């Protein structure tokens, strides 16, 4: 097949697809911008790097959003050409050429501006009726009806221009927007509110008197005034009227800004639902509707003021630090086991709580008495099999008692078993006496350990060695 240029590919794509006139204009505009930069060249001759150079040039004169429109439409043309073998390319040269546009809030029209524009149009209507002369915007009654239709419905400009006489049902108070005229290709209905009803009645009655048929364009200024000679009303005539409103109010006004405005106002009202706005504007998904929502700064300011009036209450008291417990869950009984016998202790009942306290007092004497009992308790084997080869320094009797007190006071239960403290008791007694108790393995010699010091063998098999400045080896 003969190599084709991009304009030829674009024309081929338009012929093989059912596109709206406005969509065709966008494809041709993007192709024209391409030709202005590259000239008359084959579509297969431009590479991805060439497209990036073109993007850099275009972004110097147009917005990022406009460039993305060019990129997406021409990328579609290249994809179509590659799929049908119209161009010999393996990779779409416009792939990954989209840029991230700056996110700006939707442009809306203030209520005071709308009131001024409406009052001016009403004044022009009265002026034409009283003088019989053409006003600056003529016929004023027709343009007031167009103004109110955009204000109350938020209809798209193309959808309004494509409305037929038969699409307006005054009996059911509904406007039917045909799918072939909509951006989303979906047909939907728009209810006629009370404020718009008188204006549509005037338009429909006048159209009936003029002799409109069911398929005629209902909003057609050319048939309501002899001053215009065109067959159909187009977007240029509507935009010309809004330019005059812009000059009068000093604020830019367009049909699409009315669409932004109605979406924002509906979503500021709590009784409105986002799905109502979505259906009214005929959006394909809820995310598109959310983009039209403007933040309510007055409500934000009110909430911020309320927060400032409610000062935080600061508690300057020290909060106790409660360590986290990894024990049983709250409410579950914790089993109590004897450290000597290993049997589970029975919890005390409520009836015997007082008796239990008395028994605890009798069976658990004060700490001082417990230390006296330790001094007479029998010794147990501290070292079971391994000989002692550590060095420690003697401590005084008071220090030994203080260390024992700290160990006893940390006991979590009142039934702290004295049998577990026999090791500590022996350590206290021997340190207080200035002696060290060791157990000697069978293969060791006591002389090696004591180094000539007098040692006494106790009945339980331990050797008592006096403290000295020397080290125990």
Swiss-Prot record:
Location of the region described as Disordered in the Swiss-Prot/TrEMBL record: 341-365
UniProt-annotated location(s): Cytoplasm
Residues annotated as catalytic: 156, 183, 256, 259, 283, 292 (o-(3'-phospho-dna)-tyrosine intermediate)
Record's GO cellular component terms: cytoplasm
Domain Core-binding (CB) positions: 4-82
GO biological process, any: DNA recombination
InterPro entries named among the record's database cross-references: CB (IPR044068), DNA_brk_join_enz (IPR011010), Integrase-like_cat_sf (IPR013762), Integrase_catalytic (IPR002104), Integrase_recombinase_N (IPR010998), Tyrosine_recombinase_XerCD (IPR050090)
GO molecular function ontology, one term from the record: DNA binding
Domain Tyr recombinase: 118-305
Assigned keywords, A-Z: Cell cycle, Cell division, Chromosome partition, Cytoplasm, DNA integration, DNA recombination, DNA-binding
Biased composition (Polar residues): 341-352
Note: In contrast to other XerC proteins, it has a much longer C-terminal part.
Task performed by this protein: Site-specific tyrosine recombinase, which acts by catalyzing the cutting and rejoining of the recombining DNA molecules.
Family: Belongs to the 'phage' integrase family.
Protein name: Putative tyrosine recombinase XerC
